[in-house]
């Protein structure tokens, strides 16, 4: 099954990181200017939503009509597992819009080529790798949110005002009415589980005790970060543990939902870009990475996510204040180091409620 392969490959990645396994990117740095091209064909792996990929590439093709982009789109966990499996013979030229926590695993395996696209100085320091020449560059951030269907809650004798925190999800009235993402296949699922464990004390049992209780109320774990929001919007569940943009977009379409950002703070991750370490770098890959952090691209990302990795200004529709204030203090290094154990333990405890693979 995909999720078992994903967990196994991520486990291997964590082991390689801890043992210092080298790869084809070790000691190599791409020319800062790159050998850009205005024509060619590249393969891009991404975990961006399908509709986002379509919109973003339409804009890219306006500027570079002679570059053909072959897209492989999967959820974060599947893309990460695929990149790990192909590490010694990478098929992708570029990774685009995939979780920074996954990039850190790949970076520790020397699977990423250090490269600094034009305009990288605009990217805030906390949103790109800390190496002198970055191995990955963030583009936007997404965060845990609860998407609650007010009509379904009313049937349970509840209102949206009663759900403000992680603890509120343990209400016995919600038993069988919550849908959440599987962290093995979904970046949203992993960032949420990681946040709970960090908020409850990282290496203590308190976080797992909470997840045990939450599991009692969960009807199903799905393999997409946005699917819980869509299921809440359609009335298939009362609460979808998803991410902000997914819920707000459903509300904008007229669904009877409210989007709740937990008062303890939201788990979060970055969508980031990277150049794959290969013996020969496709010049069009440099071109794509330059465009992917350009002002044009950032304007597109901002339409979907309130937090982009250049300086954020303006109003944030659907948020009470600056969304940066909603984010927990995320220990990415801890999350990457413990990813194998977290995923294995989660699978052992909760996988029985995961949806069947499509």
Task: Name each model feature, range by range.
Residues 36-104:
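Early extracytoplasmic/lumenal segment of secretory-pathway proteins
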Residues 1-42, 354-358:
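Short, low-complexity disordered leader/linker segments with a strong preference
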Residues 147-152, 197-198, 269-281, 292, ...:
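A bilobed periplasmic-binding-protein/Venus flytrap-type ligand-binding module shared by bacterial periplasmic
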Residues 173-181, 210-214, 222, 253-277, 292-315:
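Periplasmic-binding protein-like
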Residues 46-54, 77, 91-233:
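Extracytoplasmic ligand-binding site segments that recognize negatively charged/polar headgroups
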């Amino acid at each position: 099954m995909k999720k078992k392969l994903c967990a196994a490959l991520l486990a291997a990645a964590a082991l390689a990181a801890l043992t210092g396994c080298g790869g084809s990117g070790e000691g190599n740095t791409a020319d800062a200017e790159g050998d850009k091209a205005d024509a060619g064909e590249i393969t891009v792996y991404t975990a961006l939503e399908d509709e986002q990929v379509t919109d973003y590439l339409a804009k890219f093709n306006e500027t570079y009509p002679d570059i053909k982009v072959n897209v492989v789109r999967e959820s974060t966990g599947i893309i990460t597992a695929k990149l790990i499996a192909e590490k010694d013979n990478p098929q992708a030229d570029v990774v685009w819009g995939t979780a920074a926590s996954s990039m850190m695993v790949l970076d520790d395996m020397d699977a990423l080529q250090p490269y600094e696209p034009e305009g990288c100085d605009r990217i805030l320091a906390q949103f790109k790798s800390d190496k002198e020449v970055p191995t990955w560059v963030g583009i936007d951030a997404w965060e845990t949110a609860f998407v609650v269907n007010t009509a379904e809650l009313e049937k349970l004798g509840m209102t949206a005002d009663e759900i403000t925190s992680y603890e509120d999800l343990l209400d016995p009235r919600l038993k069988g009415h919550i849908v959440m993402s599987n962290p093995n296949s979904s970046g949203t699922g992993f960032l949420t589980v990681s946040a709970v464990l960090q908020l409850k004390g990282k290496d203590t049992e308190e976080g797992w005790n909470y997840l045990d209780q939450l599991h009692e109320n969960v009807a199903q774990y799905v393999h997409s970060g946005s699917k819980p929001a869509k299921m809440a919007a359609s009335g298939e569940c009362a609460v979808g543990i998803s991410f902000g943009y997914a819920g707000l977009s459903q509300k904008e379409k007229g669904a009877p939902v409210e989007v709740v950002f937990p008062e303890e703070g939201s788990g979060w991750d970055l969508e980031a870009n990277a150049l794959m370490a290969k013996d020969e770098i496709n010049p069009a890959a440099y071109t794509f990475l330059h465009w992917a952090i350009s002002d044009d691209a950032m304007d597109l990302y901002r339409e979907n996510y309130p937090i982009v990795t250049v300086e954020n200004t303006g109003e944030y529709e659907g948020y009470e204040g600056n969304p940066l204030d909603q984010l927990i203090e995320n220990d990415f290094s801890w999350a990457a180091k413990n990813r194998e154990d977290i995923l294995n333990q989660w699978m052992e405890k909760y996988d029985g409620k995961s949806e069947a693979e499509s």
